[in-house]
Structures are given as structure tokens and as C-alpha cells.
Amino acid sequence: MRRETIRCLKETAAKCRLNVVRMLRASGHGHIGGTYSSIDMVTALYFYKMNVNPEKPDWEDRDRFLLSAGHKSMVQYAVLAEKGYFPKEILDTYGHLHSKLAGHPNMHKLPGVEASTGAVPYTHLTLPPNSRV
């Protein structure tokens, strides 16, 4: 990986961290430890490795990211917002009643979320019918 690529990924990860702080400030709660410990990896996946398109979130040949530890949902929301899957203003609704950004990801509420996952150790994975994962 080139130095310029690494620099860009670090800058993007820093923006994603600010997105997490934005959600924490708006909601007053969240799992920051798990989120911050995985933000570099998830940023590198979405911005360097994965073949995804925010303008076509249901594209059949896309790569899929499954967050099995659903309590780390803020990392996924932060990166999806930075990637352009939804407006960043939605981050301000994290954890609020009827928000698309629940404490655990719900694939029926937000583009880019590939699976609904629960809390550890009770994690369950719900995939869409006929999914090719």
C-alpha cells in the first residue's frame, strides 16, 4: 500500500471518529471502546478493499460487510455516512426513538447495512432471503 493511500485512510478514519463523537453527543450513550478499536479496519475495508457503491447499495455484485458484534453499530454508521450512504445529519438521531440508527444494526432501516445483528453473546444474524454471502 502506498504512503499516500495510508495517509488518506488515516484522514478518513479520523473523520469517522468525529462521526462517532457526533453520535455520542447526540444520544448521550454508546459503546465507544469497541467502536474505536475497530474503526481503522472498517475504514480500510470500505475505502480501500471492498467493492461497494453508495449510489447502488443493493448492487448484486457488491462486497458485503457483516458486523456480528451489533453493539459496535456506531462504527458501521460512521463509516457508511462518510462513504455517502446517507446524509451525516442522520447521525444526530442515533439511539433516538424511531431512528434509522438503532443501538444494533437493522438491515431494513438503512442502506448499506447487510445484516441485522444483536448483542454479544446473544448475537443472531438475519440475512435477506436468497442472499449470496
Regions found by a protein language model. Name each.
Residues 123-128:
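Conserved small/polar residues in nucleotide/adenosyl-binding loops
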Residues 85-93:
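A glycine-rich helix N-cap at a beta->alpha junction
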Residues 1-13, 93-99:
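A short, flexible low-complexity segment enriched in Lys/Arg and Gly/Pro that occurs
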Residues 117-120:
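Membrane-interface loop-to-helix entry segments
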Residues 5-71:
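N-terminal amphipathic, basic-rich helices that act as targeting or association modules
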Residues 92-112:
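An acidic/histidine-cluster motif and surrounding catalytic segment
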Residues 74-86:
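Alpha-helical support elements that line or immediately flank enzyme active sites
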